[in-house]
Each structure stands twice: as structure tokens, then as C-alpha cells.
UniProtKB/Swiss-Prot annotation:
It is found in: Secreted, Extracellular space, Apoplast. Optimum pH is 4.8. This is Nucleoside hydrolase 3. Extracellular purine-specific hydrolase present in the apoplastic fluid involved in the degradation of extracellular nucleosides, including inosine and adenosine, and which may participate in wound and pathogen responses (e.g. Botrytis cinerea). Glycans are attached at N55, N232, N371, N485, N580, N655, N740. The keyword Ribosomal protein does not apply. Residues 1-21 form the signal peptide. Induction: By jasmonic acid (JA) and wounding. Its main location: secreted. Keywords: Apoplast, Glycoprotein, Hydrolase, Secreted, Signal. Its EC number is 3.2.2.7, 3.2.2.2, 3.2.2.1. One of its GO terms (cellular component) is apoplast. It comes from Arabidopsis thaliana. GO terms for molecular function: adenosine nucleosidase activity; inosine nucleosidase activity.
């Protein structure tokens, strides 16, 4: 029998339950765990910030993984996300990127595949083709601007302690597996689907923990509103471009008018995700095309909604995107792609407690169920034409795909694929790779699709979409807000440029350094800056993004110069693509015929772009790449700070050599591909007469078959060296020109490949900040070289200092031995031969070749220069900067 206290307890419990009433599900339910996979495009940042602003007890962002095969490069992307999370006080969120695993020829998916390539191109390494990614521009409006967020990333975001570190960075697959193993998770895909498709294919036992997948991408019934002609225009006056297309491939709509960038980045991966059996909600172009960043939204944002750091960062990003937009149609062409997707996903999840909400009811988008699929190949199916690695030259299709099935047709091979072009040259392209097509039948999947953005329920508002209001209000909430930006992080922050007073110094030999920003190039730059100015006067640096680092890595050059007190040295940015590799119709894009030889992961771009994880230890320079531009330089309009525009390599050269500058004949030292120098001497015939001599670090001259080159990723090319191979036509242009050339070939570089020899010299004394930094870099390179198979090649970067030391050292101690040879360079479009240097005594161009040098003297000269307190660092590190900015001035 129940006692009186028991009855009272029950009565109290029932009373509380009655008071809670309809809110009971919210009390008892746990938060929605969210995992985001992103390509870190600018609009992805908006979506991530929107999610971070939500109440963590309701929506918990538990992990972020990065798509490394689309709109960003892994090294720049991961550090930007770390900084964004640091601003928002969310250093607890794991970030995954890359991985060194592969897919074997039999279809076995090994652990930690990095997602650097679409699944159809993924082999056992991180080198490969750019079948789909070549549709993304490498420079302005493309990877350069996204990697740097138009220059605002370093200006605005605070820098925390988290960073990419070789062999310690969590991989994309590890973060996905860990987070989904922990419990039911909702996944939001904002970029390509490679990472998540690999997870699904490798971990079917974890599928039950995926509650729902929300996808931004594709176009089902969409009609592209951009590139349309005015209603009253004639054919002679206007030719429509993308107008009415399903997709948004603005660089290749003549081949494929159906696909959208996120799905096009890896159609097969998207197919796997859609057909996984997990419930999918798609927010395609159909819906996002109805919610542009229109002028009223922009002005409302600008005038009334910048009360938090995160809102300011979003607005600054939008503003520079608008100010640098290629035409005057920004307000009709830039949409709320990923942020709208995040909003729709959150609203559906919020309403999911209502069991009757089976049709995805939400506050922001109208929804409809459709039967769709993702097109991965083109009809007719089953015909082998060399375009489809899943089937071509195979007895058994990869992944046991069906012969004659939907994956067995022609697969678009790249830009302007002849099979994809209309036969007459007029009309729409024929390829549909990546098309989210509405179909019926067994291959279709029932997907919940957002069809359009809902209007604002407040008809008196200037903002005519409901999500406009929510987005601005969420970003500006005082809760879950950012702590500081880069400048407010430090109470005594001050931007300061360091320029030496050289008025009383008689300058020495004028030198221009052409670098591709490999680790060896930064070692060389330190050395050049330490040579007395009365011996070497470093006039300019020009960087080549056709080599071992991506264009946004130019910021590391600026930081190093700032450290050494040389903010007076101009830095020019070279062409994004090797000679003759640009697309003739849309030059900002092009293939990767040669640069594909560089790994995208460990020991390649990932490490070069971060200087093996040490770039963030350099002091932060006020100078950096920015997308600021001006009409004077061909931009459609002036931005707010056109004086901050990043100069091009050719412009830096022209400013240096124009009459009145008083510069005598210039010595050029090249440490990378010869793209910049080839363009300089080809664009202006007078340039050659202004060059006294050229020292070229690179090239390989083999006298015996056993004497191999160093293109370790292209087995068919046994005799070329990277700097020549990465732009063979440029190498041919320069080496066969009338220039006075000294070549520092691979064989000579190889003689200086011992990290220990160099470290022994540096260990004895490291009095200067630059010597200490170089020692740390060399110690890290040595450790990686010894520990991991992906780093066995990096000792080749040590030999790159030979050119700088030869130029700035003492011949009496270095004892260089030269020989003359007549050579020619192969540049025929054959990757098995291009970049090879041949001896041709009859028709070859005569150059000098460094055959031998005293290696002990090289090491001693390098170490002693770095340890010399003259021309030493003005500020030693970012840590030193932080202390200065945190201490009141005396």
C-alpha cells in the first residue's frame, strides 16, 4: 500500500509534467549532433559561423572535415578553420583534413584516404589528375582568393595555438569515424562528397548512427539566372551564356550545362551518398537561386547588423566579393548557398520533434519529395573509350560495378572534352556528369528537395526572404559570440612596417630572386637577406605558383621579410599556370599536366603551404596578399584600398627596370620553374639586355642511363628534374635564349643532401632568431625524412641553397668548378620526356654548369651567415610580437 509521502511525490511529479506539457520532448531530448564537411569556400564560412551561433544544448557542432579536392587547398583551409574556431572560443571542435591512404587497383579502400582526388582518380598516393577540379580558377576569384579569403583571413581572424603539424594533424576519415561512432549524428555536406562517400563505403556498420544527410549542391529543375541577355536585345548584341542552364559551371558550361560545382567535384562520390539508404535532404540551385545577396539585404547588413566579430567577418567577406565581382551583376549572381542550407537543416531539425512533420516543414524553404539520381557517366553505357578508369582495360569493373550500368559510359575528362561539345559548335554541351537528375525507375532515390526560399512573413520588411532576417539576427546575437578579432586580441596591437636605412650604404650586385616557395627556397631567402647589402642588393622577389606551393603561400614570404626588417622589398605574384596550360577560352583555368607530379598531401602542397607547420611561428607582416584592385589595373571597379593590390611578377620587374630607377644590369636567381622569367623575356625583348646573368637551380644532365632525375611521382620520366618538368616550355624558352646562364644541376645539388651536416654547423651556435628558426625547420625536415615514407624525397630541398650561397659566398673558399656545355630542352607535350636536358654540341645553346663545389665551405658559409648578428631579424617570432602587443608601451 502506498504511503502518504509516496502519494505526495507522485502528485508533485504529475503536476510538474502537466506544467511542462508540450515542451516535454524538448526537455527530454538531447542536442542535435552535427558534423560538417566543407570545402571552406567563403559562403561555407558563413554557414559554419551560423551553426556556431546556435545554442550548443540544442545544436552541437561536433566536428568539421575539409574537402581537399574543390575550392580550397588543404594547408590554407585547415589553418583558416582553426582560426575561425579560435575566434568563436570553440577550440574543442576537432578538424580533419587529408590523409595518406589510397584505393588499390582492385578497389580496396585503405584507411585514411585523404580525399585529394575524386574517387574515380584516386590511386595509392596523393598525386594525380585534376579531371573535375580544373574547372576551378587557380587565381583571382578561385583558389587564391578562397585560400586567403580575399586577404581578410590574416587581417581579421585571431591566431590560436592550433595549427597543421605534419604527422599530427587528424585526418578527415578519423574525425568522421570518431564522431559518428560516438552516437547519432546529422551530417551537412557543403562541398564535394568524397570524404563522406569514402566513409560510407568503408564503414557500413556505422551507417545506423547517421540520422540524416543535408546537402548543398546540384540543380534539379533549376534555371540559371546569370548570363542572360536583356529582353529586347538582338543576337548580334548579346549571346546568352549560362542562362537557363541547370548547373553553374561558369568555366565549362559549353561542355556541361547540367552540373553544379559541389556535385561535379566528384559525381561518383555524390552517387554513393544519395544511394546510401540514409535519408537525404537536398538544397539545390533550384532553391538557392531564389535567395541572392540582393542590394537591400547587403545595405541592411552594412548599416544595422555588424554588432559581433563574426557578423563583421561575414560582411567584410561579402563586401570584397562584391567589389571584386567580374561584372555588375553581383546582386543577381551571388547567392546564400551554404548558409541557407544550414538554416534549412536547422529549422527542419528544430521541427523534427513534431512526429507529423514528414515533409520537412521549416521556416525558410518550400520542400518537395522528388525521385532523383546523380549522373556519373554519359550514354551510351558499356562502351569503352578510354575515359572511364572504373571499366577501361579491366576484366572486372572496379568496386564490382555493373557492366553496362549507369557508371559505365563516357566520363567527362576535363575542360572542353570533345565528346561533350555540341557537334556544330552551337548549342548546349552534351555531358551531364554531376547532374542531379529527376528520373523514375530503380536507379532513382526519393529525396526531400528544397524548391525555393520562403518569403518574409513580415510583408512590410525591406528583406523579402524569411531567412535574410534569421541569418542577420543569429549572427548578431550576443550569445555564443566571438571573443576578439586579430587586432582586438592584443590591447596594444599596432601595424608597423620595417624598412632599413640604406642611404649610407653603397649597394652591391642587384639581384632578383624567383622562387616557388618550397622549403629550400625559404632557406635560400634567409641566406640572401643575410649577405651584406653592399655585396648583394636584393631588389625584388617574384614567386611562381606553378611549383611546390600554392599562390596564397606568398603570405609566408611577406612574413619572412617582415621578420628580417625588409618590408621595402617588393614581392610579385607570377602566373598560375605553366606556359600553354591555360584554357584558351577561359584562361584563369587550365589543366595540371605537369603540376600533378607534386603530392597534394604530406611532403607536397600540404607541407609547403604551411612551411611544414612552422609558418605560423614567423612574425605577422602587415603586408599580405589581398584581392584589393583598381580600374587602373584592369579591374571592373576600384575597391576600398586599391593601393594594397597584390602586384604581378611582370609589374615588379617592369617597375624595377624602368628608366630612372638607376638599377644596373640585374642578376636573376631562379629556384623554381622558369615560368616568370620566360614570360619576362618573351613579353619584352629589351629585358634580356637588362639581365647580366642568370643562376638557375634545377635541371638534370645525365651522362649514363643510371643517372636518374628526381620526378619520383612520374615513373615514365626518368631523366627530368622538377623545376624543368613543371614548366618545360618555359625551361626551353629560357635555357635556349641569349641569356648568360649558370646552371646548378641536380647532380651537384644531390651532393648537399645531408641534414645532419648542415645541422652540425648550426648546432654549434645559434645566436640569431633566423638561425634558430632555420635550425627548427631543418630538424623537422630531418625527422620527417627519417620517420615516414612520404618524406623520403625532401632532402632534395637542401641542395636548393647552392644557388644563393654560390651567388653570395666567397669563390676562394667555395672553389666552384664550372664546365661549358651546349644543351637543349625537350618540351614536346610528352610527360615521359618533357623537361629533359640533352647535350647537343652542334645546335645547342652554350651555358655554364656548376660541376663541383666545396660542400664543407657551403655549409659553413650558410651557417655563419645566419648566425651573424649583422642584418639580423628585427622581430624574432610571432610569440615575440604577441608579447609586444600585450605590453603597454614604455
Amino acid at each position: 500500500m502506498l504511503t502518504s509521502p509516496t502519494l505526495k511525490s507522485l502528485w508533485f511529479l504529475f503536476t510538474i509534467l502537466g506544467l511542462l506539457g508540450q515542451n516535454l520532448p524538448c526537455v527530454l531530448s538531447s542536442s542535435h549532433r552535427i558534423l560538417v564537411d566543407t570545402d571552406v569556400d567563403t559562403d561555407d564560412l558563413f554557414a559554419i559561423l551560423y551553426l556556431l551561433k546556435l545554442n550548443k544544448s540544442e545544436f552541437d557542432l561536433v566536428g568539421i572535415t575539409l574537402s581537399a579536392n574543390a575550392w580550397t587547398n588543404a594547408g590554407h583551409a585547415v589553418n583558416q578553420v582553426y582560426d575561425l574556431l579560435h575566434m568563436m572560443d570553440r577550440d574543442d571542435i576537432p578538424v580533419g583534413v587529408g590523409g595518406e591512404g589510397g584505393i588499390s587497383d582492385d578497389g580496396t579502400i585503405h584507411s585514411d584516404v585523404g580525399g585529394y582526388f575524386p574517387i574515380i582518380e584516386q590511386g595509392m598516393t596523393t598525386t594525380g589528375e585534376c579531371r573535375y577540379r580544373q574547372a576551378i580558377p587557380k587565381g583571382l576569384g578561385g583558389l587564391l582568393d578562397i585560400d586567403s579569403n580575399y586577404g581578410f583571413r590574416k587581417q581579421f581572424l585571431p591566431q590560436g595555438n592550433r595549427r597543421y603539424t605534419p604527422l599530427q594533424q587528424p585526418t578527415a576519415q578519423k574525425v568522421i569515424v570518431d564522431k559518428i561512432s560516438e552516437g547519432p549524428t546529422t551530417v551537412i555536406l557543403l562541398g564535394s562528397h568524397t570524404n563522406f562517400a569514402l566513409f560510407l563505403m568503408s564503414n557500413p556498420h556505422l551507417k545506423h548512427n547517421i540520422q540524416h544527410i543535408y546537402i548543398m549542391g546540384g540543380g534539379v529543375r533549376s534555371q540559371n539566372p546569370t548570363g542572360c541577355c536583356p529582353a529586347n536585345s538582338t543576337v548580334a548584341e548579346c549571346q546568352p551564356r549560362q542562362c537557363g542552364n541547370r548547373g553553374n559551371l561558369f568555366t565549362d558550361y559549353t561542355s556541361n550545362p547540367y552540373s553544379e560545382f559541389n556535385i561535379f567535384a566528384d559525381p561518383f562520390a555524390a552517387y554513393q551518398v544519395f544511394h546510401s539508404g540514409v535519408p537525404v535532404t537536398l538544397v539545390p540551385l533550384d532553391a538557392t537561386n531564389t535567395i541572392p545577396i540582393n542590394q537591400k539585404f547587403f545595405e541592411t547588413f552594412e548599416n544595422n547588423y555588424q554588432r559581433t566579430y563574426e557578423a563583421q567577418y561575414v560582411f567584410l567577406s561579402l563586401k570584397i566579393a562584391r567589389d571584386t565581382w567580374f561584372d555588375d551583376e553581383f546582386y543577381k549572381s551571388y547567392f546564400m548557398w551554404d548558409s541557407f542550407t544550414a538554416g534549412v537543416a536547422v529549422s527542419i531539425m528544430r521541427n523534427s520533434a513534431n512526429k507529423n512533420n514528414k515533409n520537412g516543414e521549416n521556416d525558410f524553404a518550400e520542400m518537395e519529395y522528388m525521385n532523383i539520381t546523380v549522373v556519373t557517366s554519359n550514354k551510351p553505357y558499356g562502351r569503352s573509350d578510354g575515359s572511364n578508369p572504373f571499366f577501361d582495360n579491366r576484366r572486372t569493373p572496379k568496386f564490382n560495378l555493373a557492366l553496362g550500368g549507369v557508371h559505365s559510359g563516357h566520363v567527362q575528362t576535363g575542360l572542353r572534352d570533345p565528346t561533350c561539345l555540341p557537334k556544330s559548335g552551337i548549342g548546349r554541351g552534351k555531358c551531364k556528369d554531376g547532374y542531379t537528375q529527376e528520373i523514375s525507375g530503380s536507379d532513382s532515390v526519393r529525396v526531400l528537395v528544397a524548391t525555393r526560399a520562403k518569403p518574409n512573413i513580415n510583408i512590410k520588411s525591406k528583406l523579402d526572404r524569411e531567412f535574410y532576417v534569421d541569418f542577420l539576427e543569429v549572427l548578431n546575437r550576443p550569445e555564443e559570440t566571438g571573443r576578439f578579432n586579430f587586432s582586438s586580441q592584443f590591447p596594444y596591437y599596432k601595424e608597423e612596417l620595417f624598412r632599413p636605412d640604406l642611404s649610407k650604404t653603397r649597394p652591391g650586385k642587384p639581384v632578383v630572386f624567383d622562387m616557388d616557395m618550397s622549403a629550400g627556397d625559404f632557406l635560400s631567402l634567409f641566406y640572401l637577406l643575410k649577405v651584406p647589402v653592399d655585396k648583394i642588393d636584393l631588389k625584388a622577389i617574384i614567386v611562381s605558383p606553378t611549383g611546390w606551393a600554392n599562390a596564397a603561400t606568398i603570405d609566408v614570404v611577406y612574413d619572412l621579410l617582415h621578420m628580417m626588417g625588409r618590408d621595402d622589398i617588393p614581392v610579385g605574384l607570377g602566373d598560375m599556370l605553366a606556359l600553354n596550360q591555360s584554357d584558351p577560352i577561359f584562361p584563369p583555368v587550365g589543366g595540371c599536366k605537369y603540376v600533378k607530379a607534386i603530392p597534394r598531401g604530406c611532403g607536397g602542397f600540404l607541407d609547403s603551404d604551411t612551411l611544414y607547420g612552422l609558418a605560423r611561428d614567423l612574425p605577422r607582416s602587415p603586408r599580405r596578399y589581398t584581392a584589393e584592385n583598381s580600374v587602373t589595373h584592369g579591374a571592373p571597379r576600384d575597391t576600398d584600398r586599391p593601393e594594397l593590390r597584390q602586384p604581378l611578377a611582370i609589374e615588379v620587374w617592369q617597375n624595377l627596370t624602368k628608366s630612372g630607377n638607376g638599377v644596373s644590369k640585374i642578376t636573376v636567381l631562379t629556384n623554381g620553374p622558369l615560368t616568370n622569367l620566360a614570360k619576362i623575356i618573351s613579353s619584352d625583348k629589351k629585358s634580356s639586355s637588362l639581365i647580366k646573368e642568370v643562376y638557375i637551380v634545377g635541371g638534370h644532365i645525365n651522362r649514363e642511363k643510371s643517372d636518374k632525375g628526381n620526378i619520383f611521382t612520374i615513373p615514365s620520366n626518368a631523366y627530368a628534374e622538377f623545376n624543368m618538368f613543371l614548366d618545360p616550355l618555359a625551361a626551353k624558352t629560357v635555357l635556349e635564349s641569349a641569356l648568360n646562364i649558370t646552371l646548378v644541376p641536380l647532380a651537384t645539388q644531390h651532393k648537399l643532401s645531408s641534414f645532419q651536416t648542415m645541422l652540425d654547423r648550426l648546432y654549434s651556435s645559434t645566436k640569431t632568431p633566423e638561425a634558430r628558426f632555420v635550425k627548427r625547420l631543418l630538424v623537422r625536415l630531418q625527422a620527417l625524412h627519417q620517420k615516414h615514407r612520404r618524406y623520403t624525397h625532401i632532402d632534395m630541398f637542401l641542395g636548393e641553397v647552392l644557388g644563393a650561397v654560390l651567388l653570395g659566398g666567397d669563390d676562394a673558399s667555395l672553389k666552384p668548378k664550372m664546365r661549358a656545355e651546349h644543351i637543349k630542352v625537350i618540351a614536346e607535350g610528352d610527360e615521359s620526356r618533357d623537361g629533359k636536358i640533352l647535350i647537343d654540341k652542334l645546335r645547342g645553346k652554350q651555358i655554364k654548369i656548376l660541376e663541383r663545389v666545396d660542400l664543407i665551405s657551403i655549409s659553413e658559409s650558410f651557417a655563419s651567415r645566419l648566425d651573424d648578428k649583422k642584418q639580423s631579424a628585427v622581430i624574432g617570432s610571432f610569440e615575440e610580437q604577441k608579447k609586444i602587443w600585450s605590453t603597454p608601451p614604455s
